[in-house]
Amino acid sequence: AYIVVYSTGTTGPDLLFGFSGQISMGPAAFFAIGAYTSAILATKCGVNPFFGIFIGSFLATVAGLMLAIPASKLVKHFLSLMTIAFGQIVYMFVNACAPLTGGSPGMRNIPYISIFGYELNTYFKNFVFGLILLILVLIVKNNIIRSRTGRAFIAIKENTAAAEGMGVNVRVYKAMAFGISACFTGLAGGLYAHLVTYISPETFNSTQSVLFMTMALFGGIQSLIGPIVGAAGLMLVKEVFQFLQIYQV
């Protein structure tokens, strides 16, 4: 189940970096927005988590588009610094707003996703549901990269000046890439919250952003199944190290 969650989340950074050439070190922020939005709606407002994860994904998209407005004017290194700062702002916000987010101790007893009364209360059920969403995300991603939008992303990555010369609105397409990336990662955040039923700010620190980027690079950028390979590979490595630590091999 964790593999499909992280595969979905890694699809966002892979699209942003692999196809549009924008380096974001803040995917954990969108992961957090999706997770906390869905968790808050479910625990405090009584919203069905099935709808909550999509609302969280939508808010993550809005946040991505808002960040993209100033970010579209920045070059790679300054863009990375800006996204790191955004990630820290989100991290500090969820720490500070204890009445809403639970603060440092986190949020507990987050309900499982329920579809027409059928509760996804096991890892296998969550795996199947997450796999369906992952397949849909990959279909959307594949359609995007094969469309005019995808070709515009690649043109911007290869040569921004040349892309502008061909009539590509660079700022608009950069913003679109940011928004789509945030949408995918926010969706994964919602899935994560209702899978583990407990979230805290430490789950969404800068290490999480590095993990997403590492998975994208490990699986191979500009690849449809790269996020799956990267997530599965690093999750396997993590399990091996935990096994060695437990049994002191």
For the regions a protein language model found, what residue spans apply to each?
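Single transmembrane alpha-helix segments in multi-pass membrane proteins
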Residues: 1-45, 70-79, 156, 160-165, ...
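Alpha-helical transmembrane segments of multi-pass integral membrane proteins
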Residues: 1-5, 26-27, 31, 35-38, ...
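Residue-level recognition of pore/gate-forming positions within transmembrane alpha-helices
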Residues: 2, 6, 35-36, 57-61, ...
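Membrane-helix interface segments
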Residues: 23-29, 45-51, 74-80, 122-126, ...
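Transmembrane alpha-helical segments in multi-pass inner-membrane proteins
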Residues: 28, 54, 64, 174-249
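Alpha-helical transmembrane segments within multi-pass membrane transporters and channels
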Residues: 45-88, 229-233
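Extracellular/periplasmic helix-loop junction at the C-terminal end of a transmembrane helix
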Residues: 86-119, 150, 243
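Helix-loop-helix "hairpin" substructures at the membrane interface of multi-pass membrane proteins
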Residues: 121-200
